[in-house]
């Protein structure tokens, strides 16, 4: 028996929600270990549709949810999400949800700075959601963050807000934005504290007890490897480490507890917002993929950019993310296409290169090298066994395995939870 860590292997929106939901039914605890409420996913359980941004997916399956220290939490957004899913009949209480006492908090000032800086960038925007995630992580690294445990100590909160506002109000004033008062932030946090503090726990200890008891832990990543602050397409990335190694750091367990690493990838590529995208399609095919795949962001509602599967980037994600196997999603979106292309390499200034460059200037000049494969006419939609797949679809999956140097462990053939082909059980050693 093994733990499982789920991460995105592209730029996010790969269908992690469905896969995590499928795995959560077999886990005992589901842990969020990085990110904030800037990414979301939709889960369909019976007649109910849940849209989650902060809450661990396992809650919809009656499993304990844990928010680790690597997450940044907007307490107001958290409580709003709890209220929303509770109104749908889902139990979210201190019995079912625990939050690390040392988790950094997102305050209204963080969102204000996020939006003011993005506006000041003009046409050089990063593509932030404006929800304060980046500034909250900056405060954590700069050692001025307000953490969940601080809400229990008003005297600590008082002087920490002084230190925080000394920095942030200077920035806001320089950007021509409205500044904040300590009294306003103190009142904001004091009002939220009684509802949030009951969820506080020593999460590293809780998870260690679970490990010793042999309980199955599912670590749920947000965003994806190519949005990792170190290994992604910097600076068009998120503000945290999204690779599997951070499941340990972001929850307080040892690295050996990460277990089987399952990378999620679509059978094609998408990206939201700004940043390089070598295999992006600007033609009718790109629009076709977007329409068939219903490619709109769960949180932002922004249409996603679409393109062919980029095997080079996914192979990089496999290597730096420590991926043991892939879950390939949305294969059915490719049904009926006469031919399918896969990016198998890059060209930079007339020379073939082995990997995607780190320099933004070089990234902008990269051109994809494609391999063309025959499509299939029969549908893969709803297939639940390998034998149900068209021969060309099987060839496509096998070719992806060869190119990314990782086996396809799970195959998703529709948004429905049970339309999943299992080749290997990630929870079994």
Swiss-Prot record:
Pathway: Purine metabolism; AMP biosynthesis via de novo pathway; AMP from IMP: step 1/2
GO molecular function: adenylosuccinate synthase activity; GTP binding; magnesium ion binding
A GO cellular component entry from the record: cytoplasm
Residues reported to bind Mg(2+): 13, 40
GO BP term, pick one: IMP metabolic process
Annotated cofactor note: Binds 1 Mg(2+) ion per subunit.
Enzyme Commission number(s): 6.3.4.4
Keyword Nucleotide-binding in annotation: yes
CDD domains hit by this protein: AdSS (cd03108)
Residues given in the record as substrate binding sites: 298-304
A Pfam family recorded for this sequence: Adenylsucc_synt
Main location: cytoplasm
Catalytic activity reported: IMP + L-aspartate + GTP = N(6)-(1,2-dicarboxyethyl)-AMP + GDP + phosphate + 2 H(+)
Cofactor: Mg(2+)
Keywords: Cytoplasm, GTP-binding, Ligase, Magnesium, Metal-binding, Nucleotide-binding, Purine biosynthesis
Subunit structure: Homodimer.
UniProt similarity note: Belongs to the adenylosuccinate synthetase family.
Task of the protein: Plays an important role in the de novo pathway of purine nucleotide biosynthesis. Catalyzes the first committed step in the biosynthesis of AMP from IMP.
Protein name in the entry: Adenylosuccinate synthetase
């Amino acid at each position: 028996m093994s733990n499982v860590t789920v991460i995105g292997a592209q730029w996010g929106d790969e269908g992690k929600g469905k896969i995590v939901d499928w795995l959560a039914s077999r886990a005992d605890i589901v842990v969020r270990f990085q990110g904030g409420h800037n990414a979301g996913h939709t889960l369909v359980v019976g007649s109910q549709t849940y849209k989650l941004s902060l809450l661990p997916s396992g809650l919809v399956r009656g499993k304990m949810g844990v928010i680790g220290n690597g997450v940044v939490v907007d307490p107001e957004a958290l409580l709003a999400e709890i209220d929303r899913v509770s109104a749908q009949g889902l139990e979210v209480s201190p019995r079912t949800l625990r939050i690390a006492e040392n988790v950094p908090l997102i305050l209204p000032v963080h969102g204000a700075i996020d939006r003011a800086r993005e506006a000041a960038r003009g046409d050089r925007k990063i593509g932030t959601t404006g929800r304060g995630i980046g500034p909250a992580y900056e405060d954590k690294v700069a050692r001025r963050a307000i953490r969940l445990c601080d809400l229990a100590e008003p005297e600590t909160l008082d002087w920490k807000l002084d230190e925080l506002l000394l920095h942030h109000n200077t920035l806001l004033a320089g950007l021509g934005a409205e500044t904040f008062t300590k009294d306003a932030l103190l009142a904001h946090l004091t009002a939220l504290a009684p509802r949030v503090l009951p969820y506080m726990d020593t999460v590293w200890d809780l998870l260690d007890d679970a490990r010793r008891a042999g309980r199955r832990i599912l670590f749920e990543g947000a965003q994806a490897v190519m949005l990792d602050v170190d290994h992604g397409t910097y600076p068009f990335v998120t503000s945290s480490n999204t690779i599997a190694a951070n499941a340990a750091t972001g929850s307080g367990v040892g690295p050996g507890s990460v277990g089987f690493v399952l990378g999620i990838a679509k059978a094609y590529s998408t990206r939201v917002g700004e940043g390089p995208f070598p295999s992006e399609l600007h033609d009718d095919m790109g629009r076709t993929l977007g329409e068939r795949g219903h490619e709109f962001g769960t949180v932002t509602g922004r249409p996603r950019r679409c393109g062919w599967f980029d095997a080079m980037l996914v192979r990089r994600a496999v290597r730096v993310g420590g991926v043991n196997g892939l879950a390939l999603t949305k294969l059915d979106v490719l049904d009926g296409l006469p031919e399918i292309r896969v990016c198998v390499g890059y060209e930079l200034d007339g020379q073939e290169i082995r990997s995607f460059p780190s320099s933004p200037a070089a990234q902008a000049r990269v051109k994809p090298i494609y391999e063309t494969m025959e499509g299939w006419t029969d549908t893969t939609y709803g297939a639940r066994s390998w034998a149900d797949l068209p021969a060309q679809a099987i060839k496509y999956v096998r070719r992806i395995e060869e190119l990314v140097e990782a086996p396809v462990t799970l195959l998703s053939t529709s948004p429905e939870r049970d339309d999943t082909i299992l080749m290997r059980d990630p929870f079994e050693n």
